[in-house]
């Protein structure tokens, strides 16, 4: 952000959009969160994201630029998704009861960003997420069904070795996206992981 302090003195920028993450909400025990929910990040990534949101807000106010925050849920794409991980043999199922996680396909992110170029309000926050929060196990099992393969091994959450995965499974929440859909008048191309994985399976894999 320091690199932009001088840039905005002479630039013709009309607004600032920061792509943040729903990790800023932290753990809400599987409950729904919206843009007014408490931010209480548990991971280093979430803490840093929240700080950067505030830094960008300060900078945008200094130059009187409209500012919007897009809090992205877990991103997947036609190239990076549970189907490719299952096919590679690298996927595993983590056993943790009542762990909910929201997702968003990268195409929907791009479409919403494009819409926002001509349709934005000053100092707003939007959750960018699909309609169906689900456990990682639920999504993986749907992928197994599509591919017609055996279920990968199950690992208990307290046996996870990866620090990144440990941080991921600290948080459980369902991300509400009604504000995003209403303001941008946007119908998701992939409203749930089902449509997203079906498309990838039928057209990419």
For every predicted segment, state its role.
Residues 3-44:
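Conserved Rossmann-fold NAD(P)-dependent oxidoreductase catalytic core, especially the SDR/UDP-sugar
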Residues 29-69:
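Catalytic helix-loop patch of NAD(P)-dependent Rossmann-fold dehydrogenases
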Residues 57-101:
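NAD(P)-dependent short-chain dehydrogenase/reductase
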Residues 84-92, 98-126, 130-133:
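Alpha-helical substrate-binding/gating segment
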Residues 109, 113, 128, 139, ...:
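Non-catalytic, hydrophobic alpha-helical segments
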Residues 116-165:
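Mid/C-terminal beta-alpha module of Rossmann-like enzyme folds, strongest
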Residues 141, 160-187:
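Conserved C-terminal active-site "lid" loop/helix of NAD(P)H-dependent oxidoreductases
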Residues 191-205:
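Amphipathic terminal alpha-helices
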């Amino acid at each position: 952000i320091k690199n932009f302090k001088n840039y905005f003195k002479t630039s013709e920028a009309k607004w600032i959009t920061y792509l943040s993450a729903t990790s800023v909400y932290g753990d809400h025990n599987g409950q729904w969160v919206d843009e007014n929910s408490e931010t209480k990040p548990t991971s280093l990534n979430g803490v840093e994201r929240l700080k950067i949101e505030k830094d960008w807000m300060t900078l945008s106010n200094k130059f009187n630029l409209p500012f919007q925050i897009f809090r992205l849920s877990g991103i997947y794409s036609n190239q990076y998704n549970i189907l490719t991980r299952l096919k590679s043999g690298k996927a595993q199922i983590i056993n943790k009861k009542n762990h909910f996680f929201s997702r968003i396909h990268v195409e929907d992110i791009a479409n919403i960003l494009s819409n926002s170029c001509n349709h934005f309000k000053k100092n707003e926050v939007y959750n960018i997420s699909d309609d169906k929060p689900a456990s990682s196990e639920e999504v993986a099992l749907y992928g197994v069904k599509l591919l017609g393969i055996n279920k990968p091994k199950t690992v208990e959450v307290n046996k996870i070795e990866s620090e990144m995965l440990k941080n991921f499974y600290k948080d459980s929440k369902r991300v509400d996206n009604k504000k995003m859909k209403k303001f941008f008048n946007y119908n998701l191309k992939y409203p749930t992981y089902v449509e997203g994985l079906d498309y990838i399976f039928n057209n990419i894999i």
